[in-house]
């Protein structure tokens, strides 16, 4: 069984996917962390974010490893854990450019498709491109203001600044963030985390519940 959870930036994908995975007792996989880790490595090496000819060699020189756990994901570059550094503003601002590179997307997709089911996969285009035949697909959305207010609780930045960055991120990600035709679309704005998880669990096919 494969469950995909897509959605716009800061819509709660990671928290929801982790909760669903825990409820089902299966691993949780975050594709976005791999893109963020690639972005961080490029920034630290002062590489252009839109040039795969320099970025891919950097990824091969510092192989990334995604540790998929029901309670969350950890990302490693060798013996160095990157997880705590992957949600900084500079990574937020650069990850769309890296994720738009076909070469990088192919690299991430290959790692994800090699994983054995069952699992809950969270990230952009999980249900449309990476796992189009997933057993169940969900797409999370919320207004930029709601998402900014939530993210402001996680980092020392003001809501208007975060909201402006999210609006720009939405603009850049528009093509990648469209829901699959057969996805369940959920507005997480008026819902608490546990409510969103409950909606998803209730909508799963009976054989995978």
UniProtKB/Swiss-Prot annotation:
<keyword id="KW-0067">ATP-binding</keyword>
<keyword id="KW-0963">Cytoplasm</keyword>
<dbReference type="GO" id="GO:0036430">
    <property type="term" value="F:CMP kinase activity"/>
</dbReference>
<protein>
    <recommendedName>
        <fullName>Cytidylate kinase</fullName>
        <ecNumber>2.7.4.25</ecNumber>
    </recommendedName>
</protein>
<comment type="similarity">
    <text>Belongs to the cytidylate kinase family. Type 1 subfamily.</text>
</comment>
<keyword id="KW-0808">Transferase</keyword>
<dbReference type="InterPro" id="IPR027417">
    <property type="entry name" value="P-loop_NTPase"/>
</dbReference>
<keyword id="KW-0547">Nucleotide-binding</keyword>
<dbReference type="Pfam" id="PF02224">
    <property type="entry name" value="Cytidylate_kin"/>
</dbReference>
<feature type="binding site">
    <location>
        <begin position="7"/>
        <end position="15"/>
    </location>
    <ligand>
        <name>ATP</name>
    </ligand>
</feature>
<dbReference type="GO" id="GO:0005524">
    <property type="term" value="F:ATP binding"/>
</dbReference>
<dbReference type="InterPro" id="IPR003136">
    <property type="entry name" value="Cytidylate_kin"/>
</dbReference>
<dbReference type="InterPro" id="IPR011994">
    <property type="entry name" value="Cytidylate_kinase_dom"/>
</dbReference>
<dbReference type="GO" id="GO:0006220">
    <property type="term" value="P:pyrimidine nucleotide metabolic process"/>
</dbReference>
<dbReference type="GO" id="GO:0036431">
    <property type="term" value="F:dCMP kinase activity"/>
</dbReference>
<keyword id="KW-0418">Kinase</keyword>
<dbReference type="GO" id="GO:0005737">
    <property type="term" value="C:cytoplasm"/>
</dbReference>
